[in-house]
């Protein structure tokens, strides 16, 4: 800091605790990962869309009637996105049963979007929460808290990574 002529700030109260608290780093890294994931996810959506169209896949797999038979997380919303794009395309499909990598697009991508949505919720909760411990309550009591620990954020990040890996594997299978 000195070599760059940056004046050191005066620290007060719990400033040092804030600087060494892992929550700030977790929030920042999660925000970056979330931004990258949203970009990559949309690319994976379009990649599947173009692959499906080039393959002349059976578009019935995206119909509302089919996707309401068994509701997986995000499946209906994802299928509806593809259905709305394909509904006016009248090409006859190559076959009744396409390879699994095509038939499972709405299930896998739907779960991916569900996990991303949940990640956003957990990240916003952490961003807007107080992770201090101890804290001073309104009645001026000093109490210990568990708020510094957020395993939900770590677990949903892991779920997003697993969903992305599953979607990437499907994409890989479609190009073989």
Give the label of every model feature segment.
Residues 52-169:
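Accessory "access/gating" subregions that flank catalytic or transport cores
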């Amino acid at each position: 800091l000195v070599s760059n002529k940056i004046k050191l700030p005066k620290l007060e109260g719990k400033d040092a605790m804030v600087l060494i608290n892992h929550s700030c780093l977790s929030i920042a890294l999660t925000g970056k990962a979330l931004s990258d994931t949203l970009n990559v996810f949309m690319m994976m959506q379009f990649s599947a869309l173009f692959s499906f169209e080039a393959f002349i896949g059976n578009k019935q797999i995206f119909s509302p009637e089919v996707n309401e038979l068994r509701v997986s997380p995000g499946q209906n919303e994802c299928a509806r996105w593809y259905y709305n794009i394909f509904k006016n395309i009248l090409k006859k499909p190559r076959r009744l049963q396409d390879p699994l990598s095509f038939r499972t697009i709405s299930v896998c991508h739907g779960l991916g979007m569900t996990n991303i949505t949940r990640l956003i919720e957990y990240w916003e909760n952490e961003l807007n929460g107080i992770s201090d411990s101890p804290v001073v309550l309104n009645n001026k009591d000093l109490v210990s808290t568990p708020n510094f620990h957020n395993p939900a954020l770590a677990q949903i990040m892991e779920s997003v990574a697993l969903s992305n890996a599953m979607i990437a594997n499907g994409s890989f299978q479609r190009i073989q």
